[in-house]
Amino acid sequence: MKRASAGGSRLLAWVLWLQAWRVAAPCPGACVCYNEPKVTTSCPQQGLQAVPAGIPASSQRIFLHGNRISHVPAASFRACRNLTILWLHSNVLARIDAAAFAGLALLEQLDLSDNAQLRSVDPATFHGLGRLHTLHLDRCGLQELGPGLFRGLAALQYLYLQDNALQALPDDTFRDLGNLTHLFLHGNRISSVPERAFRGLHSLDRLLLHQNRVAHVHPHAFRDLGRLMTLYLFRNNLSALPAEALAPLRALQYLRLNDNPWVCDCRARPLWAWLQKFRGSSSEVPCSLPQRLAGRDLKRLAANDLQGCAVATGPCHPIWTGRATDEELLGLPKCCQPDAADKASVLEPGRPASAGNALKGRVPPGDSPPGNGSGPRHINDSPFGTLPGSAEPPLTAVRPEGSEPPGFPTSGPRRRPGCSRKNRTRSHCRLGQAGSGGGGTGDSEGSGALPSLACSLAPLGLALVLWTVLGPC
């Protein structure tokens, strides 16, 4: 029995040695190969300028990071059918052939980060990687995401695209990533979020878009993100954000909107209302404009603080100037002119909304309908209410022709002719101007001053006549 057990032990040792030899024997010279806990070929920071030849076909993990590799040729790892983890980060990769990862059907993690010279990736590069769940493409100098780049990556859960030079998010780029939970897009140059940018991301939990140049978010951009819990939009160029875009985010818990040039006028009211109902954790939303609200948190403002832009509750018509306005360049929605049937929705600052608070303003002579008896209207009835009451006579003194009620004379009080050098002195002209000026007097005051002025000038006129007839003494 002892002799049999001794023979079995030697056989087991021989088998283990053979397994170790099969892994270690073909190991490239600059690498270390081992099989516990997984069969691994490790060649980090060895100054390699190319993918080494002779990598064991049984390798499950290959570490080639921190070298000087600039090119990954097609079929570089085709023999490694069991490969699950491949690290190529921190090299000087400038080109990856489209079929570089062909045959790696079991690959789960691929790290290509910190290759600033890469700049672009062939759309077919990741085809066939059906089990890939983590993909690092951060700090690769990427300028665009080619169409179909992530096609077929149904198992992908983590996608790192931060700190690149991406300027746009093409439609349906992530459409096949139904299991993606983490998407990192911060530190790019993205200027807008279109409607279909995140279409298909039904499982997304975390979306990081901070430190970009986002100035506009489409109202339906987040439509498929019902499971999103974290949204970072800080340090962008957002001056407005449609509340409609946030409405689908029913699971949202963490929202960061700070460090944006928010414009806190009436266009911010929908966002303000949404923030009042939000029960998760959110950053401050400091206003940049108007100046009177600069630095104040939008969430802590009152509804009547958000003034300065005509907003209709019914249909509204955009103001079009024929060129891009400063507001459009900032990503602001255009102010709206109220529909003719809904002018009551234009509010004056400091006045509550009510059915009787109708749009009021200056009515030039001839524009009012005949017989308009709506009561006195003043210059401060304009939508902005910023002009002093003494700036012009009250509009009750301005009547369009033909609008006087029956029984009133249609001709106004007779006015004195203008000053003339032939029949008036300078003092006479000054007296005439004083009697007819005032800026804030009504018609009755002007007409009452004329007879008194005529009486005061009568002796002077008589003296002039006598001087003309009799001559100087």
Swiss-Prot record:
Residues 1-26 form the signal peptide. It comes from Macaca fascicularis (Crab-eating macaque). Keywords: Cell membrane, Cell projection, Disulfide bond, Glycoprotein, GPI-anchor, Leucine-rich repeat, Lipoprotein, Membrane, Receptor, Repeat, Signal. InterPro entries: Cys-rich_flank_reg_C, Leu-rich_rpt, Leu-rich_rpt_typical-subtyp, LRR_dom_sf, LRR_TM_domain-containing. This is Reticulon-4 receptor. Disulfide bonds join C27-C33, C31-C43, C264-C287, C266-C335, C309-C336. Receptor for RTN4, OMG and MAG. Functions as a receptor for the sialylated gangliosides GT1b and GM1. Besides, functions as a receptor for chondroitin sulfate proteoglycans. Can also bind heparin. Intracellular signaling cascades are triggered via the coreceptor NGFR. Signaling mediates activation of Rho and downstream reorganization of the actin cytoskeleton. Mediates axonal growth inhibition. May play a role in regulating axon regeneration and neuronal plasticity in the adult central nervous system. Plays a role in postnatal brain development. One of its GO terms (cellular component) is neuron projection. It is found in: Cell membrane; Membrane raft; Cell projection, Dendrite; Cell projection, Axon. LRR repeats lie at residues 56-79, 81-103, 104-128, 129-152, 153-176, 178-200, 202-224, 225-248, 250-273. Residues 448-473 form a propeptide. Residues 434-445 have a biased composition (Gly residues). Residues 260-310 form the LRRCT domain. Residues 413-429 have a biased composition (Basic residues). Homodimer. Interacts with MAG. Interacts with RTN4. Interacts with NGFR. Interacts with LINGO1. Interacts with KIAA0319L. Interacts with OLFM1; this inhibits interaction with LINGO1 and NGFR.
